[in-house]
């Protein structure tokens, strides 16, 4: 997991993902069908799962999902603690670029030109849900950026069954504060 990745490899992977996403799910008649996205978040557990090669870990469900989906092998955290890291994921920028978002229990004012990834996904036609962990260290209203957020949020709540979804499930059992 700590292999160095060149800029060329990152750009090549991004281009490959863009091509794959653009052609994913072509239905009869050539009409593209966008993929559903299930994003599972598990904090503070390191790569101690079978899918990452840990021989001691018994994680058959996660391993099966990893085989069928997309497993990120070269990853890092953009912040050493949870909420600033979520800020980076939410906005796509380093938490330090919008101080004090890089500090725990701080509230940064998000610049007007910033767009969060749920806003972008919704603009692209996705139904977006998040079941927990909406402390982003900034003045974002979680209820405004997600179609549904909260403990009972689920992609099945969408009214159009042909609408693609992006569902974020935050598993809190591994969180350091638990």
Q: PLM features: residue spans?
A:
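Formylglycine-dependent sulfatase
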Residues: 2-178
């Amino acid at each position: 997991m700590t292999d160095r990745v060149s800029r060329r490899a990152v750009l090549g992977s991004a281009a490959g993902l863009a091509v794959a996403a653009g052609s994913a799910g072509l239905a009869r008649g050539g009409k593209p069908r966008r993929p559903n996205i299930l994003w599972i978040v598990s904090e503070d557990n390191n790569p101690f799962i079978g899918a990452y090669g840990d021989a001691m870990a018994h994680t058959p469900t996660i391993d099966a999902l990893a085989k069928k989906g997309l497993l990120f092998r070269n990853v890092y955290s953009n912040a050493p603690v949870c909420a600033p890291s979520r800020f980076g994921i939410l906005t796509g920028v380093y938490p330090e670029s919008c101080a004090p978002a890089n500090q725990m229990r701080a509230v940064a004012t998000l610049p007007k030109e910033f767009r969060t990834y749920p806003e972008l996904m919704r603009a692209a036609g996705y139904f977006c849900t998040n079941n927990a962990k909406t402390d982003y260290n900034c003045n974002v209203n979680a209820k405004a950026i997600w179609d549904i957020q909260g403990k009972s949020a689920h992609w099945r709540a969408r009214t159009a069954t042909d609408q693609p979804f992006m569902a974020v499930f935050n598993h809190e059992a591994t969180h350091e504060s638990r």
